[in-house]
Amino acid sequence: RSSHRNEVMKITPNLIDNLEYADIVRGSREDFEVVYKKDNPDTVYKAEIAFYCKDFIYTNGAENIVLRGKNDFKKEYPVVQTHTVSTIGAGDNFNAGFIFGLIKNHITRQMISNGLTEAQWDDLMHYATKFSANCCEDIYNYISKDFGAQMNLTLNK
């Protein structure tokens, strides 16, 4: 976050540790501008991320989501269009939707290590963007109870 701009040097060793442990790195344009002073997803990926982790998700507000993965996999995903009330919590709910997709599709760490298929990535991004969009539709910064109930019903299908 921009409020931590002055602490980048201090946190860099921990950041590198986290990158080394990561199976997937996800961050926003703002995050990478603060940490690396770079705002191009391919530049961030090639110069800062790919050495440590091959699966990379770059979010950029209402702009397309950029995915870079193993075996030179590249794809962009549109953001779900919605009536946006607040974007606070959008990234956290994107992550929650992504994790929901991992659980729903029984995607394991080994599967991630071997490289996900395009269909698997598509499904993960589907849930990530749905959760994020739902969160943005009100002032509470998390998904609605109705949306959560709908998603819960899909787990057993």
Stretch-by-stretch model annotation:
Residues 1-43, 63-64:
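Conserved beta-alpha-beta core of the PfkB/ribokinase-like small-molecule kinase fold
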Residues 11, 37-157:
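Conserved phosphate-binding/catalytic region of the ribokinase-like
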